From Swiss-Prot:
GO terms for cellular component: cytoplasm. It comes from Neisseria gonorrhoeae (strain ATCC 700825 / FA 1090). It is an enzyme of class 3 (hydrolase). This is D-aminoacyl-tRNA deacylase. Its main location: cytoplasm. Homodimer. The gene is dtd. GO terms for biological process: D-amino acid catabolic process. Belongs to the DTD family. A Gly-cisPro motif from one monomer fits into the active site of the other monomer to allow specific chiral rejection of L-amino acids. InterPro entries: Daa-tRNA_deacyls_DTD, DTD-like_sf. CDD domains: Dtyr_deacylase. It catalyses: glycyl-tRNA(Ala) + H2O = tRNA(Ala) + glycine + H(+); a D-aminoacyl-tRNA + H2O = a tRNA + a D-alpha-amino acid + H(+).
Length: 163
């Protein structure tokens, strides 16, 4: 599971259709998280990503150090599904998305990640799965962090959330 985490002072996601544009998620401050799911992802990956998002210390304390977490500052998450995080553009000019999980699996783990974040006491707004969306945000910092739960399987230094 891959997550691109962007610290924001405000963000929204709109669903665009023939009927028009509808805002389906909006936050005042916290993180915009673009979340991609691959074939081998499980509940364990969702737990790892949710735990990292909740506890990443990238907000400034009184001394100006990045020492506070999303939970510490009462921030929210705008969670947006993003299968293109598993694009492979190594050959040719059109990316392959074969590493992205099938829609049913991806949606289940996307919703589970949102549920796990809520379990941490974090307010979560979401995009709408399998729709055309437009994400607007005002980056803060900017701070952008890439997480990949696969790294926990190949690096002994990475901490894994216990079962």
């Amino acid at each position: 599971m891959r997550a691109v985490i962007q610290k924001t002072v405000g963000a929204k996601v709109d669903v665009v259709s023939e009927a028009g544009t509808e805002t389906c998620g909006k936050i005042d401050g916290g993180f915009v998280v673009l979340l991609g799911v691959t074939h081998s992802d499980t509940e364990k990956d969702a737990r790892y990503i949710a735990d990292k998002i909740a506890h990443l210390r990238v907000f400034e304390d009184e001394a100006g150090k990045l020492n506070l977490s999303l939970k510490d500052v009462g921030g929210a998450v705008l969670l947006v599904s993003q299968f293109t995080l598993y694009a492979d553009a190594a050959s040719g000019r059109r990316p392959s998305f074969s590493q992205a999980a099938p829609a049913e699996q991806a949606q289940r783990l996307y919703l589970r990640t949102a549920e796990l974040l809520r379990g941490h006491g974090i307010h979560v707004e979401t995009g709408r799965f399998r729709t055309h969306m437009q994400v607007s945000l005002c980056n803060d910092g900017p701070v952008t962090i890439l997480l990949d739960s696969f790294m926990t399987r190949i690096s002994p230094k990475m901490k894994v959330v216990p079962d």
